[in-house]
């Protein structure tokens, strides 16, 4: 998923009524927690479900959920959404992943031959999930964006792999060994990125516990806001569509996004892509799926732009003007 590489096309110059909603930075600490997610650095040992449960316990919320399960022995980047934020975890459902893996070959390998095979494995590959897998063992295609040798020491290699969601790193290393004719197995694995989110911005469970304690004990939420990101950040990998105030409540009720409701949007995006709906104050409304591509949206005056799949903003945050054909709000009027 591309991040930060899209242009913004303005369809309609329009302001937003300050009486409705609020910028994410204006939320109280309690509201910030309920509409947040974090980039967690999962340690080796616990399951991803256990880690999400600990987040829920630390923050005292009713639910927390993760995206992209990591096996107990695997460490690294694990996005975890909190409370209401779990409703839009699907924003990361197609997120590509980057791993650093340690592979052990069962025989000696030539470094140039290894690099050649790594190059050959880039692109579209066929994979069948391993025996111990939570999904049905069907042959499927996955894309390997890059496969790089970082270090070779005897029969041990350090590899960096950038892969499509749902790619099994362990199986990829097994296949690498088979192609080389010596066999190989994975000895260690760390996930260093999920789409735009890297280990550089990941926090630990201890960071989270400390931040929450400082807020509860001293009333200082500065650290808490650094550890817990506003839920709007979860949409970082997706094209954004900013909608008029008059369209917000309709989307909150699950209606599709119609062209007259669009104020501006990021492009390019294609039909079928996930898109994120935002208010003009920068609040995340929900996630939809584009019914047309961005070039068509530029010219559209009527018709449907996207189907609404998930909503995070509560109904009634903005008035239901869509029921009575509400007027737009102009800046300075």
Swiss-Prot record:
EC number, UniProt record: 5.4.99.25
Highest taxon in the source lineage: Archaea
Key word tRNA processing present: yes
Active site: 71
Disulfide bonds: none
Enzyme class: isomerase
Catalytic activity: uridine(55) in tRNA = pseudouridine(55) in tRNA
Domain PUA intervals: 238-313
Pfam families: DKCLD (PF08068), PUA (PF01472), TruB_C_2 (PF16198), TruB_N (PF01509)
Protein's job: Could be responsible for synthesis of pseudouridine from uracil-55 in the psi GC loop of transfer RNAs.
Protein's name according to its UniProt entry: Probable tRNA pseudouridine synthase B
Gene: truB
């Amino acid at each position: 998923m591309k991040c930060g590489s899209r242009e913004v096309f303005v369809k309609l110059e329009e302001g937003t009524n300050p009486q409705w909603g609020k910028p994410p930075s204006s939320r109280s600490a309690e509201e910030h927690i309920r509409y947040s997610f974090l980039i967690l650095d999962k340690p080796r040992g616990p399951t991803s479900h256990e880690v999400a449960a600990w987040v829920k316990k630390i923050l005292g919320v009713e639910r927390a959920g993760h995206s992209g399960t990591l096996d107990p022995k695997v460490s690294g980047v694990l996005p975890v959404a909190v409370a209401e934020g779990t409703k839009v975890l699907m924003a990361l459902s197609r997120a590509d992943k980057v791993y650093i893996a340690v592979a052990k070959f069962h025989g000696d390998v030539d470094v140039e031959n290894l690099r050649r095979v790594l190059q050959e494995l880039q692109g579209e590959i066929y994979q069948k999930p391993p025996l111990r897998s939570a999904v049905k063992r069907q042959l499927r295609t996955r894309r390997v964006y890059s496969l790089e040798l970082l270090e070779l020491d005897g029969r041990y290699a350090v590899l960096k792999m950038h892969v499509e969601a749902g790619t099994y790193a362990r199986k990829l290393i097994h296949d690498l060994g088979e192609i080389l004719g010596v066999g190989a197995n994975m000895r260690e694995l760390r996930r260093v990125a999920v789409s735009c989110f890297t280990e550089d911005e990941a926090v630990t469970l201890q960071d989270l516990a400390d931040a929450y304690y400082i807020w509860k004990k001293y009333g200082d939420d500065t650290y808490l806001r650094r550890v817990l990101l506003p839920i709007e950040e979860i949409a970082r990998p997706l094209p954004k569509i900013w909608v008029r105030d008059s369209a917000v409540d309709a989307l909150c009720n699950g209606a599709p996004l119609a062209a007259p409701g669009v104020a501006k949007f990021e492009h390019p995006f294609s039909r079928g892509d996930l898109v994120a709906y935002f208010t003009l104050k920068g609040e995340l409304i929900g996630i939809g799926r584009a019914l047309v591509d961005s070039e068509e949206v530029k010219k559209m005056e009527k018709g449907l732009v996207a189907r609404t799949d998930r909503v995070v903003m509560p109904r009634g945050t903005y008035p239901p003007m869509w029921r009575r054909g509400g007027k737009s709000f102009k800046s300075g009027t």
